Amino acid sequence: MSRSKRDNNFYSVEIADSTFTVLKRYQNLKPIGSGAQGIVCAAYDAILERNVAIKKLSRPFQNQTHAKRAYRELVLMKCVNHKNIIGLLNVFTPQKSLEEFQDVYIVMELMDANLCQVIQMELDHERMSYLLYQMLCGIKHLHSAGIIHRDLKPSNIVVKSDCTLKILDFGLARTAGTSFMMTPYVVTRYYRAPEVILGMGYKENVDLWSVGCIMGEMVCLKILFPGRDYIDQWNKVIEQLGTPCPEFMKKLQPTVRTYVENRPKYAGYSFEKLFPDVLFPADSEHNKLKASQARDLLSKMLVIDASKRISVDEALQHPYINVWYDPSEAEAPPPKIPDKQLDEREHTIEEWKELIYKEVMDLEERTKNGVIRGQPSPLGAAVINGSQHPVSSPSVNDMSSMSTDPTLASD
C-alpha cells in the first residue's frame, strides 16, 4: 500500500490522554477501560456493521517483557478460536514501515460487562454454575494448546447480557517467573495460586485455584485473599485455609521454605464456616443445584497443595457444573499454534519489534475484506450462538437486567 493511500485510510482522535489513530471504518470511539497493557475503546465497525472493542497496546516496545507479551498475544489470538475465548477481528498499525512502527491496535468482540460488575449482582445458582462452566471450557481449550494462564481474574473475564462468557487474555508467559518477595502490586494478583506466589513449579490446575477465588468472590461478594503484596497474601491464605502440611513445605525453595515455616501456624476454617449456607442463593429446583454442591466444588479448587487440587476435567464433571456439559464446547479441537517455543523465545527489543511487525502485516493482509481469513469459523459473526443448554428458563441465560456500559477491560 502506498504511503499516501495508507494515510487516507486513517484518522486520529484523542482518547483518555492518548491519541488513537485508527482506520476510518471504526467510528464513534468511546473509552471503556484501561490498564497495564493499554487503553480500550468501544467503536462501530462500518464494514462489519457491528460494535467492536479496540485496544491500543501501551508502549509495546518499551522493554523486552512488553514486546514479548505483545507478540505472544498476537500469535495466540490468531490461533485460538473458541466461543469462550475473546474473538480477534482485526489488527492494524497506522505506521507505514518497520522503521516507523510503534503502535499496535487489536480489534476484538465487544462485550457488555466484565466479571467484576457481574459478581455484584448476587447470582442465582444457574447463572453462577453456567458462568463457571464456560470459564472452565475456555481454560480447558487453552490447556489443550499448552497454554497455562496463571493470571485469571474477574477484570479479564467478560460477559454478554445473555450470560455468554469469554476469557480476554492469555495470562503470563511461562518464563515470566515470580519470586516470593514483598513486591508492590502492578496488577491485581489476588487470584494467583500459591505455587505462583511461592515461586514453585506448576501444572495446569494452577488455573483452578483462580477459578476457586473467583467463585468464592461470587458467593461472598468480596475478594477472598486481598493481600497488599505476596507475603501478606500468603498470610491471608493460610489464616483462612490453614498452614499446609510438612510434605508441601518440602517442595519449596530453601529461602521460601524458611520464611513459610517460621510463620505462625493456623488451623484454618472449615468450608462450612468460610462459605455458610446463608451466603448462597436458594437451591435450584430446575437443575437441582445446591449450596452443598457449590461448597464442595470450592473445597476442591481452593487447595493450597496443587497435587491435591481438582483438575479442569474433574471440575467440568462436578455435579455443580456438568448439568451444562456439551462435548462441542468442553472437548473442542485444540488450536494449532505454529510457534511451539513461543514462551521460551528470547530476543532483543528490535528483534521483537520485527517479529510483531510481521504478524501485524500478515493479519492486515488477511483482513483486507473486513474479517480475518483462514479461521475455522468467521470470528465475530454470530459469536453468541452456541449449542442448546439443558435449561429452558430465560432467566438463566439472560442477564439483560445488568445496567452496565459495554466493556472489554485490560488488566
Swiss-Prot record:
Q: What ranges does the record list as Low complexity composition bias?
A: 390-403
User: Single GO cellular component annotation?
Assistant: perikaryon
Describe its PTM? Dually phosphorylated on Thr-183 and Tyr-185 by MAP2K7 and MAP2K4, which activates the enzyme. Phosphorylated by TAOK2. Phosphorylated form is more concentrated at synapses than none-phosphorylated. Nitrosylated upon IFN-gamma-induced endogenous NO production, which inhibits the enzyme. May be phosphorylated at Thr-183 and Tyr-185 by MAP3K1/MEKK1.
Q: Where is this motif: TXY?
A: 183-185
Q: Does the keyword Electron transport apply?
A: no
Q: Which CDD domains match?
A: STKc_JNK
Q: How is its activity regulated?
A: Activated by threonine and tyrosine phosphorylation by either of two dual specificity kinases, MAP2K4 and MAP2K7. Inhibited by dual specificity phosphatases, such as DUSP1. Inhibited by SERPINB3. Inhibited by IFN-gamma-induced S-nitrosylation.
Q: Which reaction does it catalyse?
A: L-seryl-[protein] + ATP = O-phospho-L-seryl-[protein] + ADP + H(+); L-threonyl-[protein] + ATP = O-phospho-L-threonyl-[protein] + ADP + H(+)
Q: Where is the active site?
A: 151
Q: Which residues carry this modification: S-nitrosocysteine?
A: 116
Which EC number(s) are documented for this chain? Answer: 2.7.11.24
- Modified-residue entries (Phosphoserine), positions: 377
The positions annotated for binding ATP are 32-40, 55
- PTM annotation (Phosphothreonine): residues: 183
List, separated by semicolons, the cofactors it needs: Mg(2+)
Location(s), subcellular = Cytoplasm; Nucleus; Synapse
What keywords tag this UniProt record? ATP-binding, Biological rhythms, Cytoplasm, Kinase, Nucleotide-binding, Nucleus, Phosphoprotein, S-nitrosylation, Serine/threonine-protein kinase, Synapse, Transferase
Known role: Serine/threonine-protein kinase involved in various processes such as cell proliferation, differentiation, migration, transformation and programmed cell death. Extracellular stimuli such as pro-inflammatory cytokines or physical stress stimulate the stress-activated protein kinase/c-Jun N-terminal kinase (SAP/JNK) signaling pathway. In this cascade, two dual specificity kinases MAP2K4/MKK4 and MAP2K7/MKK7 phosphorylate and activate MAPK8/JNK1.
> Could you describe the subunit structure of this protein?
Forms a complex with MAPK8IP1 and ARHGEF28. Found in a complex with SH3RF1, RAC1, MAP3K11/MLK3, MAP2K7/MKK7 and MAPK8IP1/JIP1. Found in a complex with SH3RF1, RAC2, MAP3K7/TAK1, MAP2K7/MKK7, MAPK8IP1/JIP1 and MAPK9/JNK2. Binds to at least four scaffolding proteins, MAPK8IP1/JIP-1, MAPK8IP2/JIP-2, MAPK8IP3/JIP-3/JSAP1 and SPAG9/MAPK8IP4/JIP-4. These proteins also bind other components of the JNK signaling pathway. Interacts with TP53, WWOX. Interacts with JAMP. Interacts with NFATC4. Interacts (phosphorylated form) with NFE2; the interaction phosphorylates NFE2 in undifferentiated cells.
- Family to which the UniProt record says this protein belongs: Belongs to the protein kinase superfamily. CMGC Ser/Thr protein kinase family. MAP kinase subfamily.
The record's listing under PANTHER family reads: MITOGEN-ACTIVATED PROTEIN KINASE
* Name of the protein in question: Mitogen-activated protein kinase 8
According to its UniProt entry, this protein's organism is Rattus norvegicus (Rat)
Q: Which lineage do the record's taxonomy fields give for this organism?
A: Eukaryota, Metazoa, Chordata, Craniata, Vertebrata
What is this protein's gene name? Mapk8
